[in-house]
């Protein structure tokens, strides 16, 4: 993930900041949100229902508001590098901003939905007012049932929008957001007719369906929507070649590891048009492909993650996983809301502030249905790298 500069306050609401070490800022711009009032001069506000039970899991911080976190610290009995990196990011966030406002309780879900549910129950039983995590969709489904039963919100890290719901918010980078950004940019730059070439898998199907829906809402045309089985790109490339004179761009929601074969198939079919993709293309395996030079894709601006990674490496002497900034932002957000949100700091109005928040990867805001909107850049592949051709927005329009 990456960074964004601190956005200005929107409207006439109050902007609250948790200023992080090294210049990182998480901004909480809470227009019309009663849950985002300035902190009292007396310091953190104790929760309306103080937690009296014993703490569970690994704990960080010593604040009055208890927050649970569920991470895949192990998988198949072995340590999980992703889980460890997210745990480290949580520690970094606590040391930066949260030690006096929250007590974070971290439980391992063993990458299992049953264990995720047990972890949620344990943390809620220990007085957690908010659950952060899990990562996997199956775990979110099981853990969110416990959170809903307890009337507590969850900020999860899955990219599967089917697990989002009121009170179950996804902080992750969603396929739908990538598609919306790249299509809107293409249309704003004169592209009116498209082809879609997508793999027959969950990611490709969701992306292609979203592209079709958004194209209709933008009054632009999808001439062909072709799907291919793994390793069988040639036929799809030929279908695109057959309509090449009718299209302005080709959308390819394919993962980085398969893109060399896709690029080869397109080259053999002599397809030459504007290629469009998503953030999974921000990978050397795609950026170095000769056929992909000039392609556009939507992604967070690299500068945010790069700055975070420098601070992470300085503290832990290792490189962070790409998901680490999700854990960092989730803990920072929880700490900031707890510090100034009164007796119910994680209420719906606070979490769904229309002005959103500015974290390590840029601006984001939660929708009432649990999905999110993120500020994304548009990148162009050039010289075996990626350059920003449309910058990440610094704030959201109201509403």
Regions found by a protein language model. Name each.
Residues 2-23, 31-399:
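Extracytosolic ligand-binding ectodomains
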């Amino acid at each position: 993930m990456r960074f964004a500069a601190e956005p200005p306050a929107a409207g006439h609401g109050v902007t609250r900041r948790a200023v992080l070490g090294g210049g990182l800022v998480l901004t909480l711009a809470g227009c019309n949100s009663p849950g985002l009032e300035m902190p009292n001069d007396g310091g953190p506000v104790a929760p309306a229902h103080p937690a009296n039970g014993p703490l569970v899991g690994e704990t960080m911080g010593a604040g009055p508001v208890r927050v649970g976190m569920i991470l895949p610290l192990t998988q198949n009995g072995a340590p999980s590098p992703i889980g460890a990196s997210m745990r480290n990011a949580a520690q970094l966030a606590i040391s930066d901003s949260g030690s006096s406002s929250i007590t974070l309780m971290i439980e391992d879900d063993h990458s299992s939905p049953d264990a995720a549910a047990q972890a949620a129950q344990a943390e809620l039983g220990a007085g957690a007012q908010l659950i952060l995590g899990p990562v996997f969709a199956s775990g979110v489904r099981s853990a969110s049932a416990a959170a809903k039963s307890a009337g507590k919100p969850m900020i999860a890290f899955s990219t599967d929008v089917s697990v989002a719901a009121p009170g179950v918010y996804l902080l992750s980078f969603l396929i739908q957001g990538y598609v919306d950004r790249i299509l809107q940019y293409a249309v704003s730059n004169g592209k009116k007719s498209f082809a879609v070439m997508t793999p027959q898998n969950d990611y490709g199907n969701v992306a292609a369906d979203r592209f079709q829906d958004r194209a209709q809402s933008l009054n632009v045309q999808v001439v062909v929507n072709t799907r291919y089985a793994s390793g069988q790109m040639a036929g799809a490339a030929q279908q695109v070649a057959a309509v090449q004179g009718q299209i302005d761009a080709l959308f390819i929601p394919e993962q980085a590891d398969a893109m060399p074969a896709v690029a080869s198939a397109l080259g053999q079919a002599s397809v030459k048009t504007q290629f469009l993709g998503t953030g999974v293309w921000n990978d050397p395996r795609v950026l170095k492909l000769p056929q992909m030079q000039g392609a556009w894709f939507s992604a967070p601006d690299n500068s945010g993650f790069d700055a975070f990674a420098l601070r992470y490496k300085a503290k832990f002497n290792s490189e962070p996983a790409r998901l680490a900034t999700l854990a960092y932002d989730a803990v920072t957000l929880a700490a900031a809301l707890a510090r100034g949100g009164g007796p119910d700091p994680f209420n719906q109005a606070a979490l769904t502030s229309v002005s959103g928040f500015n974290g390590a990867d840029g601006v984001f805001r939660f929708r009432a249905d649990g999905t999110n909107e993120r500020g994304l850049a548009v990148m162009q592949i050039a010289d075996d790298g990626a350059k920003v051709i449309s910058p990440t927005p610094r704030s959201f329009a109201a509403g």
